[in-house]
Amino acid sequence: AGHYETQIGDFLALLKKEPDFRRLVIFGAPGSGKTTLMRYLSLMYANQTPHELHPKAPQFIPVLLYLREEYPKILKNPVLLEDFLPQWVAELQKSKPLKTPPGWFAQQLREQRCLILLDGLDEVADERDRQRLRDWVDEQMYEYPETPFILTSRPAGYTEKAELKQDAVVLEVEPLDSEQIREFIRNWYLALETKKQGGQTDLGVQDDAAQQAQRLIAEIEQNPDLSEMASNPLLLTMIA
């Protein structure tokens, strides 16, 4: 398979018109930003702004399931998504449960209106449970062929009894490059200083943040071990 760099928006633009791209699996090391990416996609679609990722990205209703939290319920009663999601929605806000009209999710799923985001396909410790969860995901993809699915997994966890039987396009989250590391650090310190100053972003705050950022950037660029760690977003926040 060839290796080339692209943006997630390029794939979102193809979700409706290209059946081959309706099944995406996103690989990434722990802390590489897989869950953050899924949350970001969910937010962009919930705000009806996917065009910011790509001008041709179609609108969907996002459904983000954290499999590490949901898999016990799924395996206890492995029903179709159209039966699982109404109960899931009702439990999102227990103080004031949300109710969807009967058959609403079934209609949305069959009319290609939902984007199913499944985070952490590999995050089930028991091997048999992981296989059963994989089978359930496969069943949903088979049952709703028009509905796009995006899954995340660690590479090792995906091949160890979690690989899908359905054909999927596999993408990989790339490590941060040096310019992305610098931008991340600058934004990180600006956010910290702004919060520290009660939301103010005057020149003094910006200057303090810039000085702290520059010190860390210099330290990382002079230390190969730190530089390697900094390419992982989670480890970079720990260094900062």
Feature locations, PLM:
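P-loop NTPase signaling cores
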Residues: 1-240
